Amino acid sequence: MNVFCLGLSHHTAAVSLRECFAVGGDESATVTNDLRAAAGLTEVVLLSTCNRVEIYGAAVDPSAAMEFASSFLQCRAGRTADFARYEGAAAVQHLFRVASGLDSMVLGETEILGQVKDAYAAAFGAGHTGPALNRLFQHAFRAAKQVRTESEIGRGAVSVGSAAARLAASALGDLAACRALLLGAGEAGEDVARSLHSRGLMELLVANRTSTRAEALAAGLGGRAVEFAHWRDHLATADIVIACADAPSRLLRAAELAPFLAVREGRPLFLLDLAVPRDFDPAIRALSGATLHDIDALEAVAREGESLRAAEVAKAEAIIAGQVAEFVRRGADRPTLAVAA
């Protein structure tokens, strides 16, 4: 079996390191092409999300390929990292667990399956997959579906948005007296907005580069859309600022925030940065009057209640074990009709 996985996740690296290795959607094709050539991979799929950056590949010599891939990624990032490495059946098990939400920060969440499917579809469309990875990923999707239908791993799970709202409430108390400014109106932003609204938020302001998305999200929750170019104008009056805008560079630096804090008359400002790479300057933590958290702060909140789902986790893990055994038994090198999920 010549498949492998190499990468970083929230289990092994803080966001300060993960963001250095993150690959944005606009650069994914170029990075994948360069990686495949540099590491001598016969097949490759690149998965980059807020909580993980992973390379799934097939090569004649997986160990050597992982060394080349590791060197390529570290050279590109300008940072060193201790990558997790999986080969053969271990790589199969890891992908099946990832696709099923068993390896997620929010245990049992379903967004990761869509992200894995998107990563595979992009690689498939670019001709980067072949018999080994086509079969591996198609089986992973079946395993994830079985976990979803035969276990209740997702029941009672908190979403990223609900964890964010819970963290804000723990810092500020009753959100009915709070005004929130949300940067980004994508799936994550919508999840956050709905979770804040469900906790009785006094007012929601939404800023997004595409104004129509901000307007639609705000209108659906009784909020107000603000121009993305002028969102900083609301820093003096907002109580909560949450970023998930996937910006190409920092949206807010400490020096930019300081003047707004000076006119807040001691009112605390809660900032939460859910983006990877991060949208807010980490130096903001040193400013008096502001509290800044990043996505890693959600892990403790997301883990609450997991003990109540222990039986479902065990059931899901048993399903994965059975699917891995079936995959190995049938042989990883047998060609499969290539059909994108």
Regions found by a protein language model. Name each.
Residues 10-12, 16-29, 188-194, 198-200, ...:
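N-terminal loops that bind phosphate or other acidic moieties
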Residues 43, 201-205, 267-270:
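Short active-site oxyanion
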Residues 78-176:
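Glycine/serine-rich phosphate-binding loop and adjoining beta1-alpha1 elements at the start
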